[in-house]
Amino acid sequence: MAIPIPARPSGYRLGQVDAPIMVEMFLDLECPFSKRGWQNVMSVVKAYSPQQVRWIFQLMTLGNHRQSWDATKATIAVAGDDTQKFIDFVSYIFSRQEEFANEAWKDKTQTDFHHLLATFAVEANKQQYAAEATEYKDKAQFIDRLNSKDVYAQARIPARLATMRSVWSTPTFFINGAEATSLSSGSSLEDWQAVLDPLLSASV
């Protein structure tokens, strides 16, 4: 089935549209490698200006991560179209990842998880680094939004895009449309600089 044409391009975007380098990251919120990669990428984001690098973050769900789909929907419900809210909430939810890993959740239900996600949405606002992350103060309001058709439709787009792009593991990185196979979850700032700096020099 083809991807329905979205109202806006898939993913959360950071940086200027005319930046010479575009980095696209596919990540899974239940994946420990995505968590590690996210933490490293955040240091790379800070090292380059918006004029140098444009970032696109795409949420996807790996088949062996049962809670990832609802975590993805929760992030979309919280962030809306706001990239900074997305970054803040993803950072927060990764800090709580052990609480919804498969092993921790094997005897619990989807409804239980929805209530945990509602707690995340409320408590994220109390974190200093996520002070503006979420507007939700009422858990019932959040759960209604989480289960809405609109959020479901938005979450499907990057998931299908990942399939079309042959992304089967996370994190996966693309630079200017080409898969960056030399970069992984463990890549340091120096590793990223070794890839990005020559590209920036060539673009001048």
At which residue positions do the language-model features occur?
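A generic helix-loop boundary/linker signal
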Residues: 13, 31, 64-65, 145, ...
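General secondary-structure edge motif
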Residues: 11, 54-55, 73, 135, ...
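Short, flexible hinge/linker loops that cap or flank conserved catalytic cores
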Residues: 15-18
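Structural alpha/beta surface segment adjacent to cysteine/selenocysteine redox centers
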Residues: 24-29, 35-121, 165
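A structure-centric feature marking long, well-folded core domains of fungal metabolic enzymes
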Residues: 9-11, 21, 65-66, 79-80, ...
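C-terminal cap of thioredoxin/glutaredoxin-like
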Residues: 2-5, 21-27, 38-46, 118-204
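N-terminal "domain-start" segment that seeds a small globular fold
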Residues: 1-13
